[in-house]
């Protein structure tokens, strides 16, 4: 088995790397727009099953099923950064790649570039991911890095933090949280470039309810079933699951996070609050009118003891939970949706002064190792400085070693 290819790109805060393994995950988990797909030469493409991920030698995915111009085709799929990688790796001479029926690449090939060919000399259909991605490639790379094993980085980060005085520790994580916030707002802005406000909110909510393993099928459903349609037709959650078969992951899911359970919650939400994106916009806008002013990140530390009380965060949270979402999504998942979805979207739309809310908002879902780092580095004391979303995000950004 050869080592996966690695490419470097320029991100918002410096270079980042992407491996072919990430591209394979994007393909295998369906983390891209799948409506009205076309191959690079213009043929209609429909993905019935992406194939079984092959981590051994040979093609990256086995036994995929697709439709090309409506005709069923079965075989293997190979994933590369560029179409030229097929020839560079010598696949056109390797019988192990003789059953490949689709070449998936990140970058679309130039019109003058010759197609990849199999061992029989037949041109392979090519599909380019880049223009179909739900997010900026950097966001995929960050999510992938944070979904891996963070334990090896834990001790190194704790050591770096404890080498600083407490005030500098907090300032360091505050600065990292600010960078994380700017990235989230930037990525939300990219989503708003492709979708209007209602659709962007709809896609964001369904993606968040899908967790890491089921973001792809949830986003596919969001594209296929607009919010208005879900509110009016009220399909059964089982019907929605069946609409994108062979794409759901149930490995390691707690019962509360099963796709049917989360879809049932969102359908209840859509039924009770079909206008929830407008409610969200008006509610968050009212916070700015209530007197919150944009503040520089370093000014926030002095607000820690009283921010939640002074800016009525309990009331704000309750309003979002009830006025916007009708109490349909309980627990930390809704809190995560506020921090990862609602607030960045509102900021990207132009609402100012939201970073303090985002930083001092209640903590949502987070890996245990992150909470352990916050505790061991004595960032919070349980009195004047409590655990909040901002401290969690600062640690997460620090773990990326950017």
Annotate each predicted stretch with a short phrase.
Residues 65-76:
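Active-site beta-strand-loop-beta-strand hairpin of nuclease catalytic cores
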Residues 174-401:
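Hydrophobic, aromatic-lined core segments that form the binding pocket/scaffold
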């Amino acid at each position: 088995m050869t080592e996966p290819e690695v490419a470097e790109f320029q991100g918002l805060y410096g270079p980042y790397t992407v491996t072919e393994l990430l591209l394979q995950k994007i393909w295998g988990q369906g983390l891209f727009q799948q409506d009205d797909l076309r191959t690079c030469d213009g043929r209609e493409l429909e993905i019935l099953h992406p194939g079984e991920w092959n981590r051994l030698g040979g093609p990256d995915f086995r036994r995929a099923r697709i439709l090309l111009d409506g005709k069923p085709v079965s075989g293997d799929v190979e994933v590369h950064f560029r179409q030229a990688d097929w020839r560079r790796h010598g696949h056109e001479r390797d019988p192990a790649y003789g059953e490949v029926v689709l070449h998936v690449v990140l970058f679309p090939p130039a019109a003058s570039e010759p197609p990849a060919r199999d061992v029989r000399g037949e041109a392979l259909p090519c599909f380019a991911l880049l223009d179909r991605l739900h997010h900026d490639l950097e966001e995929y790379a960050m999510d992938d890095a944070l979904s891996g094993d963070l334990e090896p980085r834990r001790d190194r980060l704790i050591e770096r933090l404890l080498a600083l005085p407490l005030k500098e520790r907090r300032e360091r994580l505050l600065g990292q949280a600010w960078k994380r916030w700017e990235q989230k707002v930037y990525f939300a802005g990219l989503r708003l470039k492709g979708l209007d406000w209602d659709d962007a909110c709809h896609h964001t909510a369904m993606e968040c309810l899908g967790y890491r393993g089921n973001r792809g099928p949830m986003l596919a459903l969001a594209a296929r079933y607009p919010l208005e349609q879900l509110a009016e037709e009220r399909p059964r959650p089982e019907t929605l699951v069946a609409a994108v078969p062979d794409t759901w992951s149930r490995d390691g899911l707690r019962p509360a996070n099963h796709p049917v359970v989360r879809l049932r919650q969102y359908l209840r939400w859509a039924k009770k609050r079909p206008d929830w994106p407008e409610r969200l916009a008006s509610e968050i806008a009212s916070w700015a009118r209530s007197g919150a002013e944009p503040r520089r990140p370093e000014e926030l530390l002095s607000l820690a003891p009283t921010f939640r009380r002074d800016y009525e965060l309990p009331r704000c949270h309750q309003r979002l939970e009830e006025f916007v979402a009708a109490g349909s999504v309980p627990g930390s998942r809704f809190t995560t949706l506020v921090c990862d979805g609602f607030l960045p979207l509102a900021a990207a739309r132009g609402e100012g002064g939201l970073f303090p809310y985002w930083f001092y908002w209640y903590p949502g879902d987070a890996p245990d190792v992150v909470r352990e780092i916050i505790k061991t580095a004595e960032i919070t004391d349980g009195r004047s400085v409590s655990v909040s979303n901002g401290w969690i995000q600062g640690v997460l950004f620090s773990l990326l070693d950017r």
